Structures are given as structure tokens and as C-alpha cells.
């Protein structure tokens, strides 16, 4: 298990755009399992939507991408290579249910 401090060593993102809280499983260069505890204090809930807060889908995708970039970036960092990893495109993305305050995202 890796906490937020380890995540910040690998990813360049910071509040409010660091969207993963913890890595709970990792196979470097292959996969990672992260979690994001979604709270009512997330800055995007103020405007999305008042009275019915929903996490924007693009931020759910961003959290998944950060998880994948961590899986690749940690090995690059350990090997002292440039840890910069970018995600360029996504096709056929579907959201099965809304993400609301109190939810825990399991990102794989």
C-alpha cells in the first residue's frame, strides 16, 4: 500500500487535481489499483451541481489515467528515467452510475 506522499513523488499533480488517495496494489509497468474517497468538500461539487452534487465524468477518467500513469511512472522513476507520462486519447467510455459524495472509487 502506498500513501499520498508516495503518489506525489511519482505524479506531478497537486490539489485540486490530484485525484487518487492511495495505491492499494501495484504491478509496476503493468497495472495499479488506487482508491479515491470522494467527499462533499471536493471543489467541483460547488458548481456540479448545486443541490445534486455529481463528480464530473471527465474527472473520473482523469483519476483512472492518474492510476495508470502511476503504474508506469513509478518504474521509470526507480530507473532514474524521465518520469513524465502522458495520456492522449480515450474511445468508447461509458459511465455506469453517478459518483456522489461519500463514494469510494476503485480505480484499476
Task: Give the ranges of each region predicted by the language model.
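Beta-strand-rich interaction surfaces with strong enrichment in secreted/lumenal proteins
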Residues: 8, 51, 95-97
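Catalytic strand-loop segment that frames the active site of acyl-thioester-processing enzymes
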Residues: 15-55, 60
